[in-house]
């Protein structure tokens, strides 16, 4: 009997209290890291929509420039969804930018330079990114916000 007690004392291992303390420490660390990781995920999503908006703006500007080069001097270029009446379609822009056509919103031209894209809206996953060529009061050309319901 005494030998069994001595054998139990020689066993190495963690007590239940030590294991609970480790679990509590891990829970505290997880609680501190979750908000920080959520912030990084939101920033990454914003950067992704800005990147896709930038690709869409470049694709639209490229197609508008090509269409303008084929027209007479002083003629205007139109963007729309009807290939028969519009010079550039949103589908062509989406194909060139490799984005879904449903994500492309309103596109407007500069009033002084009718071949320059002035604004473009791009919506994805509940967020809208608005490109403004010449922002006033702000130096940001790409602004991400919650999607507006129209």
Q: Model-found features: residue ranges?
A:
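Extracellular/periplasmic head regions of type IV pilus-like filament subunits
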Residues: 72-132, 143, 148-150
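Aliphatic-rich helix starts adjacent to a transmembrane/signal segment
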Residues: 37-57
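Alpha-helix exit/C-cap motif
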Residues: 58-80
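Residue-level signal for short amphipathic helical patches enriched in basic/charged
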Residues: 11, 29-32, 44-47, 51
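N-terminal single-pass transmembrane signal-anchor helix
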Residues: 12-38
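N-terminal leader/signal peptides at the extreme start of proteins
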Residues: 1-14
């Amino acid at each position: 009997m005494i030998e069994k007690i001595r054998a139990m004392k020689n066993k190495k291992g963690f007590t239940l209290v030590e294991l609970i303390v480790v679990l509590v420490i891990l829970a505290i660390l997880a609680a501190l890291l979750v908000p920080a990781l959520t912030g990084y995920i939101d920033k990454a999503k914003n950067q992704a929509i800005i990147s896709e908006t930038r690709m869409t703006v470049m694709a639209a500007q490229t197609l508008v420039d090509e269409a303008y080069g084929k027209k007479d001097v002083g003629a205007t270029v139109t963007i729309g969804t009807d290939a028969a009446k519009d010079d550039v379609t949103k589908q062509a822009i989406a194909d060139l930018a490799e984005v879904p056509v449903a994500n492309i919103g309103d596109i407007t031209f500069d009033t002084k330079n009718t071949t320059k894209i002035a604004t473009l809206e791009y919506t994805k996953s509940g967020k809208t990114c608005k490109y403004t060529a010449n922002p006033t009061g702000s130096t940001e050309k790409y602004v991400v916000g919650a999607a507006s319901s129209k």
